[in-house]
Amino acid sequence: KFGEYSSIFEFIQNAIDAKIENKIPLVKINFDSIKKKKFESLITKEFIAHLENSPRVKNLSETLNDEEVQTLILEDFNTSGISGEPGTWGLKTLDGKDNPIFRFNNCIGVEAKLEDAVLGGSEGEGRQTFCHASEISTFFYHTIRHNELNKPLMMGFAYL
């Protein structure tokens, strides 16, 4: 509905929801052009085949032929990062705890994720805005979890 702005609103809400206790979350928002060479390895033949078959992706050949890609870069600080076990397939980790990273990457509208819906983010649907703001319906993210600073993650998903 609001294009890139919806993803910015969602991002800010997520940063507030993930604030580290007694710290004010900070956000940095930037529109930038990035040379395609920086992330060409992420755009595989298999991925392109999926994009070609998606009704959501428009102007694919034009987008893929551009030497620079317009990006929306969203950064947050004083937040917990996306916790959980990325290699565990399920809403719970192997030790029975919630698995937010699985929910973020794989679930849309699967039961309430927060006990207090007033905080926002209670339905698990807002993350779709990141893909809707993308011409190739794709979103990449880098997360540094506050309890695992030495294990940053680079992940992404496409809403095809």
Predicted features, each with a name:
Residues 6, 21-25, 83-87, 141, ...:
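N-terminal switch/interaction subdomains of large nucleotide-dependent motors and GTPases
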Residues 2-37, 41-62, 126-131:
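Conserved ATP-binding N-box helix of the HATPase_c
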Residues 46-51, 91-96, 159-160:
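Short, low-complexity, polar/charged sequence segments that are solvent-exposed and flexible
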Residues 49-54, 142-153:
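Extended, regular secondary-structure scaffolds
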Residues 155-157:
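An alpha-helical interface "stripe"
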Residues 36-38, 81-83, 148-149:
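Eukaryotic short linear interaction motifs
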Residues 135-138, 151, 160:
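Extended, Lys/Arg-enriched charged tracts that mediate electrostatic binding to polyanionic substrates
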Residues 55-145:
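Flexible ATP-lid and adjacent glycine-rich G1/G2 motifs of the Bergerat
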